[in-house]
C-alpha cells in the first residue's frame, strides 16, 4: 500500500455495493395494528428517522440537550457528560483540566483520551485517525457550539465503528434555523477560581437562517482565553464552523460544513505527594505544552425517494496537526512530538421499507470507505543549549472498508433488529530508513436488538452486540510472524426498560460485557512489545429518573432528576486476575433540582464518584511520587441562578458556583508527567446570553 497516496482506493467496490442495495421487491399490504415511524431524515446522528426515537431505541441511550447543558453550569464537554449514566470523566492524563483533550470512560473501560468509544461530531469521527490513533489526546470541538450530546452505550455497534466497545458518542453542532430571517446569539462567560489565581473568559456567537430560496446557512464560533486553576496553565482555543443546507426539492437536500479549530494549552502535569501538600496548585513543569489545529469539510446528500425509501451519502475530509513538549525528570531535556494526519471518508446508505404479511421490514445497508495518512515524529531539545537531536519518524497508512446491514422488523408491538457489520482493514507503519510493519485484518460483528412496546409509555429492550477495537499504529512495531496482532473483541448483553410520559422519564439497564483479546504491552520487555493477552469482565446497573411537576399544581416549575450507576470491571488475565481495572469508580451518581418561576431559574446539583485504583495491581498505599495509590472518592455540589431579561426574548444572565464546599480532591496521572492532579477548587462564574 503506498504510504503517501491519498486518492480513494477501491471506490468502484463502494459504488457496486451501493447499487446492489437498490431493491426491486414489491411491497405488500401493511398490518394496521403495527404503528411505525415515517422514513425521513431528522438530523439525528443515527441517519434516518427510523431509529431516531430514544423512547423506542432497543439499547441504553441518553440524550442531553442544550437547555440541560446550560443549566448544569458545565464549561467543557467533560463537565457536561457527568450526568450521563455509565459515563465517567477520568481526567487521568497529562493534559487533564485543559481544552486540548477528552477523557471519557464508559462502563469501566479506560478513560484516558477516550480510546474505547466511537466519538463523532455531526456523524463524522472526531479522532485524528479513527483506526490508527483513536485516542482523543486532541479533541477538536468545544461545548458552546454543541446543540446536543447523544450517548448510545449499547445497540449501536452495527452502524458505527471502529472503536465501538464503549458505545457511540455523538456531539451535534447547532442546527441551521429553518425560519426566515436572521437568528442569532452572542454570549460571554467569565470564570474565576477560588484558589490558584486563575481566571478565563469564554466567548460564543451564532448567526443563521434560511432564505426564501430554501438556502440555509449558519456561522458558529466559540473561543476561550485565560488560565485554569493551576499556576502556568494558560489555555486558549478557537472553534469556528460554517454550515450550509439547501433543499433542492421536497425530497432532496444538500448539506455542507466547513470547520476550523486550534488550541494551545500549558500542562502543569502531576505533583509528588510532598509537592501537593506544599501547594496543590503549583506548576513544576512550566515548559510543558500541547497544541493542535484541524481544518475539515463535511458534505451530505439525502434523497427521500418515496414514502418507503431513502438514500443518504456522507463524505468528509480533514487535516489535523498536534504537537507536545514534555521535560524529562532531570529538567535538562525536552521531548517534542509533532504529528500530522489526513483522513478521507465516504459513506453511502440506503433504507427500504418492505411489507411482508403482518411484519414491516426497514432494511438499511451501508458502506464506508475511510483512508488515513499521517506521520509521527519525535526529537529532543537540550534545555541549556537548545540543540536538537535527529528526528525519528514513522509514516502511517490505513485503508478501511466497512459494510453493514440491519433489518428493523416491526410486528405488533415487537421491534426486532438483527444486523451485521463487516470490517476489512489494511494498515502499514513505516520507519524512516527502517522496516515496514503491516497488518491485514477483517472482522464480522453480528448484533441483535429487541424492543417490546409494552404500553405507549413503557418500552422493554434487550440486545446482544459484538464490538471491536482495531490494531493501532504504535502497536504495529512489535508485530512479527510469530506474534501477529488481531483486533480486540467485546461481546455485550443488555436488558432494560424505559418509561416516558408527560411528567416522568425513567430508565434502568443491566449490562454484562466480556472484553477478550485485548492488546496489552508485555511487562518487563524492551523494546515495548504488544500481544493479544488482555481480558476484562464488566457488569453493572445503570438507572436514571426525571420528574416534572404539573404546571397547574402547587409545585409548578419544579423538575427533579437523579441517576445512579454501579459498575464492576475486573481483570481476567495475567498476574492481576480478579482485581479491579484501573481508573474507574464502582459507584457514581448525580442528583439535582431545577425550579423556574417568573423569569427566574434556580438549579442545584450534585455529582459523586467512589474511590478508584490507579494501577492494575490495585495498590492502596500511595508512593512518594504519587504515581500509584488509591484515589479517594468525592461528592461535589453546584448551584446556579439565571434571570431572563424582560423585553429581550430568550436572553439571560446567570451566576453560578461549582464545588460549593471547596472540596480539595485529585486524581492521578500516570503519563510521563505523573503524579497527583488537583481538581478544580470552588469556581465562580457569570455568563450572559443575548438571543434574537
Enumerate the language-model features and the residues they cover.
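Transmembrane beta-barrel wall of Gram-negative outer-membrane proteins
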Residues: 196-225, 229-268, 289-304, 357, ...
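C-terminal beta-signal and adjacent terminal beta-strands/loops
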Residues: 558, 610-617, 642-692
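Membrane-embedded beta-barrel scaffold of Gram-negative outer-membrane proteins
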Residues: 186, 204-205, 300-304, 310-326, ...
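Extracytoplasmic beta-strand/coil segments of soluble accessory domains associated
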Residues: 78, 82-125
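Face-selective signature of the C-terminal outer-membrane beta-barrel domain
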Residues: 247-259, 291-432, 437, 545
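Short acidic/polar hinge/loop motifs at secondary-structure boundaries
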Residues: 124-153, 242
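Surface-exposed extracellular loop regions of Gram-negative outer-membrane beta-barrel proteins
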Residues: 264-266, 270-279, 371-384, 426-431, ...
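Gram-negative outer-membrane beta-barrel transporters
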Residues: 350, 357, 413-416, 512-514, ...
Amino acid at each position: 500500500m503506498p504510504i503517501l497516496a491519498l486518492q480513494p482506493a477501491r471506490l468502484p467496490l463502494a459504488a457496486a455495493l451501493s447499487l446492489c442495495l437498490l431493491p426491486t421487491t414489491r411491497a405488500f399490504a401493511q398490518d394496521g395494528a403495527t404503528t411505525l415511524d415515517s422514513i425521513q431524515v431528522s438530523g439525528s446522528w443515527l441517519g434516518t428517522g427510523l431509529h431516531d426515537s430514544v423512547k423506542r431505541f432497543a439499547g441504553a441511550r441518553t440524550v442531553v440537550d442544550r437547555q440541560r447543558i446550560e443549566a448544569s453550569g458545565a464549561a467543557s464537554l467533560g463537565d457536561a457528560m457527568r450526568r450521563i449514566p455509565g459515563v465517567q470523566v477520568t481526567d487521568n492524563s497529562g493534559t487533564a483540566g485543559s481544552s486540548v483533550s477528552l477523557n471519557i470512560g464508559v462502563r469501566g473501560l479506560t478513560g484516558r483520551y477516550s480510546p474505547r468509544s466511537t466519538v463523532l461530531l455531526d456523524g463524522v469521527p472526531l479522532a485524528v485517525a479513527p483506526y490508527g490513533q483513536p485516542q482523543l489526546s486532541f479533541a477538536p470541538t468545544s461545548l458552546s457550539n454543541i446543540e446536543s450530546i447523544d450517548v448510545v452505550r449499547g445497540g449501536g455497534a452495527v452502524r458505527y465503528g471502529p472503536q465501538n466497545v464503549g458505545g457511540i458518542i455523538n456531539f451535534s453542532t447547532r442546527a441551521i434555523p429553518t425560519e426566515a430571517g436572521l437568528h442569532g446569539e452572542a454570549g460571554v462567560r467569565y470564570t474565576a477560581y477560588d484558589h490558584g489565581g486563575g481566571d478565563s473568559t469564554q466567548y460564543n456567537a451564532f448567526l443563521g437562517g434560511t432564505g426564501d430560496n430554501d438556502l440555509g446557512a449558519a456561522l458558529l464560533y466559540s473561543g476561550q482565553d485565560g488560565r485554569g486553576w493551576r499556576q502556568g496553565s494558560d489555555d486558549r482555543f478557537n472553534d469556528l464552523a460554517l454550515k450550509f443546507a439547501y433543499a433542492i426539492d421536497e425530497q432532496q437536500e444538500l448539506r455542507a460544513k466547513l470547520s476550523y479549530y486550534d488550541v494551545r494549552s500549558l500542562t502543569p502535569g502531576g505533583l509528588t505527594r510532598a509537592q501537593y501538600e506544599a501547594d496543590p496548585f503549583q506548576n513544576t513543569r512550566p515548559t510543558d505544552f500541547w497544541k493542535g489545529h484541524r481544518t475539515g469539510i463535511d458534505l451530505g446528500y439525502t434523497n427521500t425517494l418515496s414514502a418507503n425509501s431513502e438514500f443518504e451519502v456522507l463524505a468528509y475530509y480533514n487535516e489535523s496537526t498536534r504537537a507536545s513538549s514534555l521535560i524529562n525528570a532531570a529538567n535538562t531535556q525536552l521531548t517534542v512530538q509533532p504529528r500530522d494526519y489526513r483522513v478521507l471518508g465516504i459513506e453511502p446508505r440506503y433504507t427500504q421499507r418492505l411489507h411482508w404479511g403482518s411484519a414491516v421490514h426497514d432494511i438499511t445497508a451501508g458502506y464506508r470507505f475511510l483512508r488515513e495518512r499521517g506521520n509521527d515524529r519525535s526529537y529532543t531539545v537540550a534545555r541549556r543549549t537548545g540543540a536538537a537531536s535527529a528526528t525519528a519518524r514513522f509514516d502511517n497508512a490505513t485503508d478501511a472498508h466497512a459494510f453493514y446491514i440491519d433489518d428493523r422488523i416491526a410486528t405488533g408491538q415487537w421491534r426486532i433488529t438483527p444486523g451485521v457489520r463487516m470490517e476489512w482493514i489494511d494498515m502499514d507503519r513505516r520507519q524512516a530508513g527502517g522496516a515496514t510493519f503491516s497488518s491485514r485484518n477483517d472482522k464480522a460483528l453480528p448484533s441483535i436488538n429487541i424492543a417490546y412496546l409494552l404500553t405507549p409509555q413503557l418500552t422493554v429492550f434487550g440486545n446482544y452486540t459484538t464490538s471491536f477495537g482495531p490494531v493501532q499504529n504504535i502497536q504495529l512495531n512489535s508485530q512479527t510472524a510469530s506474534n501477529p496482532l488481531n483486533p480486540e473483541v467485546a461481546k455485550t448483553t443488555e436488558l432494560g426498560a424505559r418509561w416516558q410520559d408527560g411528567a416522568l422519564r425513567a430508565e434502568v439497564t443491566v449490562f454484562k460485557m466480556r472484553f477478550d483479546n485485548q492488546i496489552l504491552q508485555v511487562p518487563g520487555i524492551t523494546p515495548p512489545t504488544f500481544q493479544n493477552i488482555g481480558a476484562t469482565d464488566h457488569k453493572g446497573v445503570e438507572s436514571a429518573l426525571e420528574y416534572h411537576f404539573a404546571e397547574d399544581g402547587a409545585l409548578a416549575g419544579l423538575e427533579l432528576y437523579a441517576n445512579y450507576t454501579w459498575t464492576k470491571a475486573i481483570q481476567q488475565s495475567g498476574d492481576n486476575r480478579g482485581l479491579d481495572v484501573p481508573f474507574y469508580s464502582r459507584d457514581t451518581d448525580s442528583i439535582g433540582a431545577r425550579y423556574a418561576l417568573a423569569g427566574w431559574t434556580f438549579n442545584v446539583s450534585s455529582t459523586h464518584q467512589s474511590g478508584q485504583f490507579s494501577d492494575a495491581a490495585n495498590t492502596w498505599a500511595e508512593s512518594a511520587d504519587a504515581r500509584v495509590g488509591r484515589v479517594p472518592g468525592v461528592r461535589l455540589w453546584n448551584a446556579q441562578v439565571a434571570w431572563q431579561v424582560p423585553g429581550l426574548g430568550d436572553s439571560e444572565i446567570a451566576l453560578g458556583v461549582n464545588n460549593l464546599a471547596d472540596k480539595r480532591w485529585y486524581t492521578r496521572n500516570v503519563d510521563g508527567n505523573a503524579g497527583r492532579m488537583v481538581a478544580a477548587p470552588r469556581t465562580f462564574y457569570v455568563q450572559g446570553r443575548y438571543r434574537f
